Regions:
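Catalytic phosphate/metal-binding cores of nucleic-acid and nucleotide-processing enzymes, i.e., regions
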Residues: 1-94
Length: 94
């Protein structure tokens, strides 16, 4: 059995989304180009693909998935701030 690779920032991003009030389901184990996260926030459903940094590219499977996906766009996030922005909110700086 092979396991899906989880980006190092995955847990941090999931925790921040949940703290912001989102429901988060990790889809990382699905493979076949499926985005990493299913996110529900304020009656909206989002898909998020986590990347380790700004330079990381989509895999061919991810590109194929997004090309066939009939729902909303997949958000590419590489940081907590990017994930929070994808929700349409700005994180408060303390």
């Amino acid at each position: 059995m092979t396991y899906a690779r989880i980006d190092t920032n995955h847990k941090e991003i999931v925790a921040a989304l949940r703290q912001a009030g989102a429901t988060v389901v990790s889809l990382a184990a699905m493979k076949h180009g499926c985005p990493d996260l299913l996110v529900g926030y304020q009656n909206e459903t989002l898909l998020m693909e986590i990347k380790k940094d700004k330079k990381a590219k989509f895999t061919p499977d991810q590109i194929e998935f997004m090309g066939k996906w009939k729902g909303g766009a997949v958000s590419r996030v590489d940081s907590v701030d990017a994930a929070i922005r994808a929700l349409g909110i700005t994180r408060k700086v303390l």
